């Protein structure tokens, strides 16, 4: 039996369901500690029709490669706030175990890694004889599912921005260690006074493992974005190189805002604007992390870890800003060349 792509709670609120593939529940239901239920649809799913019916057969095939074509929910682009309690009247079920931040980050990292492996490299796609450039322009989009890749990229970038906001504060508020609990103990004649704590020195106050997971997700996302940027530059180069009277059959991904479908000639511009905006948000998240690390660098319990994390953050921030700059210049160049509206 087919089930909705969104859980009942997200469906009723008309929100995109942020459930990661392989996870038993979505992050909204996990945060609210309520049941995440997927019911049959009220009417059959209907795959979206491709924009260019005459010559987009390969794009239509790739768009429906994973079953139902589910596009990115643009109305829910940056909806990162907490959701309200479950509406009354819904069936009550025992809530599934709430995923930890580490589980959600690990699932996101695995999804990004699979995406990177699925996108052909520059060596595989961007080397072609000049004599075959025209034929190559008509088939360049058949090497991978561009629509699905971009939809997933936007989903994962939004999820990472949300997880940054949760994981960074949690990394600086680790649970109290045994030695610290002994020092804070107010129980009269407590037995802890007759035993030796496992650690004679306080454990680090920074959760280095959790921070490394966050940064690993961001690095892998940048790997995917850099690969797609190379693909975009190759397409732009072909447009500028081919004869003026030749219109290559590039498969422009479909952009939907509610029931509105953006025209093909403006869809690419909208897509680039959203990618740049999401990268801007992620750069700001790294800067927030740097500021928080700087606040604890003089704490004796976090000094060494803070130095390592600060260096990692600096490297990540430099690369994130570089990737953001590349996408911004790419978009501006296309606008200047009147290839985008």
UniProtKB/Swiss-Prot annotation:
It is found in: Nucleus. Keywords: Activator, DNA-binding, Metal-binding, Nucleus, Transcription, Transcription regulation, Zinc. InterPro entries: AtrR-like, Zn2-C6_fun-type_DNA-bd_sf, Zn2Cys6_DnaBD. Residues 7-36 bind DNA. SMART domains: GAL4. GO terms for cellular component: nucleus. Its main location: nucleus. One of its GO terms (biological process) is positive regulation of DNA-templated transcription. Positive regulation of the major cellulase and xylanase genes (cbh1, cbh2, egl2 and xyn2). Binds to the 5'-GGCTAATAA-3' site present in the cbh1 promoter. This is Transcription factor ACEII. It comes from Hypocrea jecorina (Trichoderma reesei).
């Amino acid at each position: 039996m087919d089930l909705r792509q969104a859980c009942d709670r997200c469906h009723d609120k008309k929100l995109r369901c942020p459930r990661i593939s392989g996870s038993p529940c979505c992050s909204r239901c996990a945060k609210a500690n309520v049941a995440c239920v997927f019911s049959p649809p009220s009417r059959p799913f209907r795959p979206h029709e491709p924009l260019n019916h005459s010559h987009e057969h390969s794009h239509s095939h790739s768009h429906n490669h994973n079953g139902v074509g589910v596009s990115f929910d643009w109305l829910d682009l940056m909806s990162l706030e907490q959701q309200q309690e479950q509406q009354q009247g819904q069936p009550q079920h025992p809530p599934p175990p709430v995923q930890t931040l580490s589980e959600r980050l690990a699932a996101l990292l695995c999804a990004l890694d699979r995406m990177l492996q699925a996108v052909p490299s520059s060596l595989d796609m961007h080397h072609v004889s000049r004599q075959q450039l025209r034929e190559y322009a008509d088939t360049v989009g058949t090497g991978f599912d561009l629509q699905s890749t971009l939809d997933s990229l936007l989903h994962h970038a939004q999820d990472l921005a949300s997880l940054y906001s949760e994981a960074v504060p949690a990394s600086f508020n680790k649970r109290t260690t045994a030695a610290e609990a002994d020092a804070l103990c107010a129980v009269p004649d407590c037995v802890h006074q007759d035993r030796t704590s496992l650690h004679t020195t306080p454990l680090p106050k920074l959760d280095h493992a959790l921070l490394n997971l966050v940064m690993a997700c961001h690095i892998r996302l940048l790997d995917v974005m850099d690969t797609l940027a190379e693909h975009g530059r190759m397409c732009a180069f072909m447009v500028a190189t081919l004869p003026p009277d030749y219109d290559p059959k590039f498969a422009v991904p479909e952009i939907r805002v509610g029931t509105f479908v953006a025209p093909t000639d403006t869809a690419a511009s909208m897509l680039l604007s959203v990618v740049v905006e999401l990268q801007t948000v992620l750069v700001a998240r790294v800067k927030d992390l740097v500021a928080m690390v700087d606040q604890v660098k003089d704490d004796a319990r976090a000094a060494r870890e803070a130095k390592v994390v600060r260096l990692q953050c600096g490297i990540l921030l430099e690369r994130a800003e570089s990737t953001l700059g590349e996408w911004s210049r790419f978009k501006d160049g296309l606008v200047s060349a009147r290839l985008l509206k």
